[in-house]
A protein has these predicted regions:
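Catalytic cores of alpha/beta
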Residues: 118-124, 300, 361-375
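Glycine-rich beta-alpha loop elements in corrinoid/cobalamin-binding modules
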Residues: 36, 40-175, 386-388, 392
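Short catalytic helix/loop segments, enriched in acidic residues and glycine
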Residues: 20-41
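Short, solvent-exposed turn/loop segments enriched in Gly/Ser/Thr/Pro and often Arg
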Residues: 57, 260-267, 292-293, 356-361, ...
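Hydrophobic/aromatic residues located in beta-strands of well-ordered beta-sheets
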Residues: 3, 107, 153-154, 257, ...
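Radical SAM [4Fe-4S] cluster-binding motif and immediate context
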Residues: 32, 183-354, 372
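N-terminal [4Fe-4S]-dependent radical SAM core
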Residues: 9-19, 24, 159-210
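C-terminal accessory regions of radical SAM enzymes
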Residues: 2-22, 157-160, 164-166, 350, ...
């Protein structure tokens, strides 16, 4: 059976370098690879199906090219994968264009936003036959065998006789080792490693990809939908399976990989085993992770650095304990400072801090405290983004109860908190304080961490011509 998989992107979250094509002729993209559809492609191919992937970041495959390929090759199923509410409008447009030119092909939506809003999505976008909820590997294998009658396919939302039907949820799969490595070679794109800065900066020109070694995060941060999507559970692949994929990547020419786990630092024994496996296999591939500052695995930072972990990114959010508590981060400023310093002392090359501004109940003094706090941390890079609220997060539910958002009419939207929450500072104040704070922060870094700042600028400037 022939299946098409399309990764739908919000144009804000990727960029094309000035030199768009690599020497091998493949298009280069500054952004993360679509690991979701790559994983599904590998599963489908192992089961004997044919699979073709498209990524909307590729300028060679705009919507009309994808639609022409669908009409010419007549796949049995076209799956559109998208991450969040920001890419949902683009998925709707493509689905309606596909349906306008082909009344027979089966269409499916998948991804976090689709999973959390399945019935509403099906009602708003009737052109789509199936909305798939949760993990997709076994779901898509079951679905392709029952396209005409998905009654028995757990995790699917569909319609019959004009009525939306929500099949029971799938049992969350804990054995992640059973799935093959993602199909990274069939999509003719090369991804450029870049930092998540307001102005994306190229980090290296090594062949780059992403991996997922675990799924989920059990912490209750009010702005995050991950605990709801993963039912508050954390699931992980075995160290042996992770090291085997790293070895596979190095053998195929990859020099750098970023783990897109929501919280890599959760299980120290597993981390230790992964580092030992990398050392025993004598791998040289570099890798990066995200994690919480209160992780008990910080004593393993030296082992991670020895195993070529180059980047650690922390969700710091604020330099005000009041705001951290308001966001239910369950971390302290002391833990932030300890984690960042431990990572740098261990030899982690790049330590990044994610911060939010425009938070509920945040004052100008809180914002200034955040920039002052950031200036004293030995961070290599940092980002300060306006806090947004999405359906599926605890903060959204709070705003529904407070009458700030309408569940019936706003479910597919997202808002900057400062646009709707009267306890937030006005947007113009946030932008002014942020601009002033960044100026002070950069000056502080230059004078107090000159070597660190010089090394970072040298790294970025080295690759600026490709942008």
């Amino acid at each position: 059976m022939l299946i098409f998989l399309v990764h739908v992107r919000d144009p804000q979250f990727y960029a094309l370098p000035a030199k768009t094509r690599a020497k091998n002729g493949r298009v280069r993209v500054m952004g993360f690879p679509p690991i979701g559809i790559m994983s599904l492609s590998a599963v489908l191919k192992r089961a004997g199906h044919d699979c073709v992937m498209f990524d909307q970041a590729n300028p060679d495959t705009p919507n009309d090219v994808i639609i022409e390929a669908i009409n010419r090759r007549r796949p049995a199923l076209v799956g559109l994968s998208f991450l969040s509410t920001t890419s949902y409008p683009y998925a709707k447009i493509l689905a309606r264009q596909i349906r306008a030119g082909n009344s027979q092909v089966k269409l499916a939506f998948g991804g976090v936003f689709a999973s959390l809003n399945a019935s509403l999505v099906k009602l708003q976008c009737p052109e789509v036959d199936f909305v798939c909820r949760g993990d997709g590997e076994q779901l898509i294998l079951d679905l392709v065998e029952r396209l005409d009658d998905p009654t028995e396919v757990a995790g699917v939302t569909w319609a019959k006789d004009g009525k939306v039907i929500q099949n029971p949820n799938r049992v969350m799969e804990r054995n992640l080792d059973q799935w093959p490595f993602p199909d990274r070679e069939s999509l003719e794109l090369d991804f450029v490693e870049s930092m998540p800065l307001d102005v994306p900066a190229v980090l290296s020109m090594e062949r780059f990809t992403t991996m997922q070694t675990s799924r989920g995060c059990p912490w209750p941060c009010v702005f995050c939908d991950i605990p709801i999507f993963n039912e508050g559970k954390w699931r992980a692949r075995s160290p042996q399976h992770v090291v085997a994929e790293l070895k596979h990547l190095e053998e195929h020419g990859y020099g750098s990989v970023y783990f897109v786990d929501d919280h890599f630092l959760l299980q120290p024994k597993r981390i230790d085993a992964i580092c030992n496996g990398i050392t025993q296999e004598r791998l040289s591939i570099q890798w990066g992770i995200e994690g919480r500052v209160d992780s008990v695995a910080q004593h393993l930072f030296p082992a991670m650095a020895k195993a070529h972990c180059r980047t650690v990114m922390f969700g710091i959010e604020s330099g005000s304990q009041k705001i951290l508590d308001r966001l239910q981060k369950e971390q302290t400023l002391e833990e932030v400072e300890t984690a960042v310093k431990n990572a740098k002392r261990a030899g982690i090359e790049i330590v990044h801090g994610f911060f939010t501004v425009g938070n509920p109940d945040e004052t100008v003094e809180d914002m200034k405290a955040t920039f002052d706090f950031a200036s004293k941390l030995p961070l290599d890079t940092f980002g300060f983004n306006r806090l947004c609220v999405y359906r599926g997060t605890p903060l959204w539910q709070e705003y529904v109860k407070r009458g700030l958002v309408n569940e019936a009419t706003d479910w597919y939207k997202y808002f900057k908190c400062s646009e709707i929450d009267p306890t937030c500072l006005p947007g113009e104040v946030i932008n002014r304080v942020r601009q002033e704070g960044l100026r002070r922060l950069f000056l502080y870094k230059i004078f107090h961490y000159p070597v660190q700042t010089y090394r970072l600028l040298r790294r970025f400037l080295r690759f600026m011509p490709v942008r």
